[in-house]
Amino acid sequence: SVILKPASLTPASAIALTEIIAKQDLPTGLFNLIIGSGSGIGKLIATSPEIPAITFTGSVEVGKSLYADASPHLKKMQMEMGSKNPLLVLDDADLPTAINCAANGAYGGTGQKCTASSRIIVQEGIYKKFVEGLTDHISKIKVGHALEEGSQMGPASNQSQFESNLNYIEIGKREAKLAYGGNPMNMRTPGF
């Protein structure tokens, strides 16, 4: 059987998945959803003799803690932590495709997914055109409430994530040339 424990601040998609699975002709208890604090529930899962394996996606800090709790019990573990996914754009790349992939990879899901493109490595021969095209593309992204019609990018999931985003922007300003934005937006809707 499977126990799904989503991030405590963003359980909606896990609830929707559970509702879909519940409508299937599956044995009771095959799929289980637990919502709550990761520190409490994670430790219970990690130390339970009834749970032989864990798959974890999240931060390095939380992953280390989970591993420390689970390893004495010789559990099988699969961990994907602190992703920093690069996107490589070569000189012979199809420019519109590369720009679209970069924008979707970096900004899709407000960049809050483990598969987000955290860095883009661009060869010198295509660099200028790529930056110009990407800047134009992202300037057209409609930022708004996540459920607002036409909104393409919603808010950060919490204040801590928002502050982390701002910190990365400041690092970028110090270590590179800013091409677009760089300041928090003044939005009329709640969120971060």
Locate predicted features.
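Glycine-/small-residue-rich active-site loops that bind phosphorylated ligands and cofactors
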Residues: L9-T10, L33, L87, V122
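Conserved beta-strand segments of alpha/beta enzyme cores
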Residues: G29-N32, K177
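Residues that form or flank phosphate/diphosphate-binding pockets in enzymes
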Residues: A12, G40, K129
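Conserved small-residue-rich beta-alpha loop and adjacent elements
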Residues: S1-T28, P52, P96
